[in-house]
Amino acid sequence: MLEELKQAVLEANLQLPQYRLVTFTWGNVSGIDRERGLVVIKPSGVAYDKLTIDDMVVVDLTGNVVEGDLKPSSDTPTHLWLYKQFPGIGGIVHTHSTWATVWAQAGKGIPALGTTHADYFYGEIPCTRPMTNEEIQGAYELETGKVITETFRFLDPLQMPGVLVHGHGPFAWGKDPANAVHNAVVLEEVAKMAARTYMLNPNAKPISQTLLDRHYLRKHGANAYYGQ
């Protein structure tokens, strides 16, 4: 079942340690088959160097395991909520990558300080509000998804393919699992660049709207011309 998607999700998960986005098992990637309403996700707590295609877990959009012998990632409810709320996305990544997590722990969004950021994220990468005690003590992973979508009430998830969960870490997404990992890698890099920029110049300001528009829209706008 869903062998092609399983392979894509496996390969995307294996990219996380390659790009140094994870330590031990601190992360997961999923992908969705929209037509069938099924999600493939990494199993919980399995080391990346042990993962095989047969370990991938298939769940439906209510979280029931459809295929697989292992438990799905503990973050599955977050992934499922985001898929239901963001219909344009096809893959999701969660990590505790160092620099993005630093910003999440500081409770700060990442301003668009340069064109590297603007090529991928159309403005400041937001940080959610802190979760309440009730949210944390309740259906925690589902509530994590809800606090993300609350943060995106006035944001387009296709123009802003990532978020920082306050005190937790980053989530990123894309058109498919590989694209989601790509965006997660960029998020980590711009988080590092921004932190180091503020070390050199604590008064650094975001780039102008004109420059932000130029760089984002030349890659993603209606008249995009970047690339082949």
Curated annotation (Swiss-Prot):
Cross-referenced Pfam families: Aldolase_II (PF00596)
Alphabetically ordered keywords of this record: Arabinose catabolism, Carbohydrate metabolism, Isomerase, Metal-binding, Zinc
InterPro entries per the UniProt record, alphabetical: Aldolase_class_II_sugar_metab, Aldolase_II/adducin_N, Aldolase_II/adducin_N_sf, AraD
Transmembrane segments: none
Co-factor(s): Zn(2+)
Cofactor, free-text remark: Binds 1 zinc ion per subunit.
Catalytic reaction annotation: L-ribulose 5-phosphate = D-xylulose 5-phosphate
A GO biological-process term: L-arabinose catabolic process to xylulose 5-phosphate
Cellular component terms (Gene Ontology): cytosol
Residues annotated for substrate binding in this entry: G27, N28, S44, G45, S73, S74
Active site (catalytic residues): D119 (proton donor/acceptor), Y226 (proton donor/acceptor)
CDD domains: Aldolase_II
Domain of life: Bacteria
GO MF term set: aldehyde-lyase activity; L-ribulose-phosphate 4-epimerase activity; zinc ion binding
Family to which the UniProt record says this protein belongs: Belongs to the aldolase class II family. AraD/FucA subfamily.
PANTHER family: FUCULOSE PHOSPHATE ALDOLASE (PTHR22789), L-RIBULOSE-5-PHOSPHATE 4-EPIMERASE SGBE (PTHR22789:SF8)
Functional note: Involved in the degradation of L-arabinose. Catalyzes the interconversion of L-ribulose 5-phosphate (LRu5P) and D-xylulose 5-phosphate (D-Xu5P) via a retroaldol/aldol mechanism (carbon-carbon bond cleavage analogous to a class II aldolase reaction).
Name of this chain's protein: L-ribulose-5-phosphate 4-epimerase
Gene assigned in the entry: araD
